[in-house]
């Protein structure tokens, strides 16, 4: 379920249960070395409610699914002024951080070049990542999913990729 546009359009509990049941079927069918990443988004395509609207709901799904289910953080999927570095810290602490869709945003899920609008926030996120991964003895290159999620409609994708990894 992608949520709802207005009150009364969706039964929140049924939407959660239906999504959980679907995820449980997928999780049960996974090959042994696969993981499930549950991504959340505060809005879009709907604005009244989302079935996986924040990191807490994603973590709830991941915990209900099992040890190979994790929360994926997309930097553009938060409400304005969300403390993403705190979210990263807590998910790392719980061993439930899957990885990232790296991008940036000014107005919503803009999928802009990572660090182009909020470079200091990106620094704070990486500060938590290094400290938290070191505390857990994690491999910086392999233990999380590192993905760039930028819009090819905004600028040349190769240019964006090069600027993102600089």
What residue ranges belong to the model's regions?
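Gly/Pro-rich active-site loop or hairpin
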Residues: 10, 48-56, 78-165
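A cross-domain feature marking catalytic cores of carbohydrate-active enzymes
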Residues: 1, 38-42, 71-77, 101-104, ...
């Amino acid at each position: 379920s992608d949520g709802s546009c207005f009150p009364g359009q969706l039964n929140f509990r049924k939407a959660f249960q239906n999504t959980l049941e679907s995820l449980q079927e997928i999780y049960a069918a996974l090959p042994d070395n696969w993981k499930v990443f549950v991504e959340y988004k505060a809005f879009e395509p709907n604005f009244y409610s989302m079935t996986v609207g924040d990191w807490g709901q994603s973590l709830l799904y991941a915990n209900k699914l099992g040890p190979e289910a994790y929360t994926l953080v997309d930097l553009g999927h938060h409400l304005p002024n969300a403390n993403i570095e705190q979210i990263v810290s807590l998910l790392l602490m719980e061993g439930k951080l899957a990885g990232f869709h790296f991008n940036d945003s000014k107005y919503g899920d803009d999928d802009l070049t990572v660090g182009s609008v909020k470079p200091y926030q990106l620094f704070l996120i990486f500060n938590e990542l290094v400290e938290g991964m070191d505390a857990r003895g994690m491999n910086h290159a392999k233990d999380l999913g590192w993905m760039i999620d930028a819009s090819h409609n905004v600028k040349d994708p190769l240019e964006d990729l090069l600027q993102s990894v600089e």
